[in-house]
Amino acid sequence: MLTLLAILVVSYIVGSIPTSLIAGKMLKSIDIRDFGSGNAGGTNAFRVLGWKTGLTVTLIDIIKGVVAAVSVVAFFRHHPIDVFPDINEVALRLLAGMSAVIGHVFTVFAGFRGGKGVSTAAGMLIGIAPVSMLMVIGVFLLTVYISRHVSVASILAAIAFPLIIAIRKYLFELGAGLDYYIKLFNAKFFFHDSLDYHLIIFGLIVAIAIIYTHRANIKRLLAGTENRISFGKH
């Protein structure tokens, strides 16, 4: 029990690192929450700090999710405080990753006012199901390129994830042959691509949550007032 608690606490602290706030303070001496949408996430960093900084912030937030779902769990597997949790591996990684997402949204380092958790959730899922997430990232990037709305891309990518897992698992069984190449590079633990049913359930919950956290963006999209990002600045 103590080991599970430690995993959740450390993952929360990792997720709580306020990347966009640090970038805003370092680059412009501002609190990014006072500008744009008022959110401390990657989307607002794109708007306020430019696409290069926004991309950097997003990548770091993604890494936070990967670290929580993979590295934190791996560390405590080899250095448990008491008995290592006897639960489904994917479920454990999801718990650690979600703790990081909660940390990102309710960061202890910034008055519990953080981002929306999209990038950190994406990082968590990259650590668990990298092949499926490559497809989801493709959906995200294509949508950003076409629409110039990161919010739209985030929503569509969230919806795409459980659909892709379900299609791969129950219709095509894509990616099963990857194990040979994974073992060849001796990286099966890190890059193991799961199609566990927990991911479908979790993906549906996350999709609903992301749609809910983007409700203000959806209102602005319907009103035609949602800001677009530009690839020609900064």
Curated annotation (Swiss-Prot):
GO terms for molecular function: acyl-phosphate glycerol-3-phosphate acyltransferase activity. It catalyses: an acyl phosphate + sn-glycerol 3-phosphate = a 1-acyl-sn-glycero-3-phosphate + phosphate. Pathway: Lipid metabolism; phospholipid metabolism. GO terms for biological process: phospholipid biosynthetic process. The keyword Transit peptide does not apply. Keywords: Cell inner membrane, Cell membrane, Lipid biosynthesis, Lipid metabolism, Membrane, Phospholipid biosynthesis, Phospholipid metabolism, Transferase, Transmembrane, Transmembrane helix. It is an enzyme of class 2 (transferase). It is a multi-pass membrane protein. The chain crosses the membrane at residues 4-24, 56-76, 90-110, 122-142, 152-172, 191-211. It comes from the Bacteria. It is found in: Cell inner membrane. GO terms for cellular component: plasma membrane. Its EC number is 2.3.1.275. Catalyzes the transfer of an acyl group from acyl-phosphate (acyl-PO(4)) to glycerol-3-phosphate (G3P) to form lysophosphatidic acid (LPA). This enzyme utilizes acyl-phosphate as fatty acyl donor, but not acyl-CoA or acyl-ACP. Belongs to the PlsY family. NCBIfam families: glycerol-3-phosphate 1-O-acyltransferase PlsY (TIGR00023). Probably interacts with PlsX. This is Glycerol-3-phosphate acyltransferase. It comes from Chlorobium chlorochromatii (strain CaD3). The gene is plsY.
